[in-house]
């Protein structure tokens, strides 16, 4: 389901915890604060999420609980602008920032996240499978020079307990897919999915 930034701030305010990992939500007022709050509440009532100013509907409980699970998760992955919280029940909460400060929030089985990635990045379905894996040390400066003209790069950050544990980038060059581990400064050619 899609929500405005103000609606996400509302859900954040009624769930446990303060911050939504990786997503800087703010209540940005264009008019008076009271008018914006009223507009936000009316929008949630129109979507069937709120029954009144103080009561969630059954349909409203689902996104509120999804955001709460996202906030409680200890394991997060950020792939470009895709924010993923891995849950213990082989599920994931995915929050996708859209245009105009809107967000789409999905609760999916983890395997569906792979399908979503293949749908968003069809280039993952192409490429060659190398017979030998060759690891190559490459300093960050030469890597940045190499990747500056590459398009459709995928940046991945893996987080545990809100701390970055691993960071790497997939990029395409000369019809080949490469992975660069930013922590270890190692480049390798990878095969297609």
List the model feature ranges, each with a label.
Residues 3-5, 20-27, 32, 51, ...:
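Non-catalytic recognition/regulatory regions in large multidomain proteins
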Residues 41, 45-55:
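A short, conserved structural fragment
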Residues 39-40, 141:
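Generic hydrophobic/packing signal
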Residues 31-35, 39:
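Alpha-helix boundary/N-cap detector
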Residues 12-14, 53-58:
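A broad, low-specificity signal for short, low-complexity segments enriched in glycine/proline
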Residues 1-16:
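Short alpha-helical segments that sit at the start of domains
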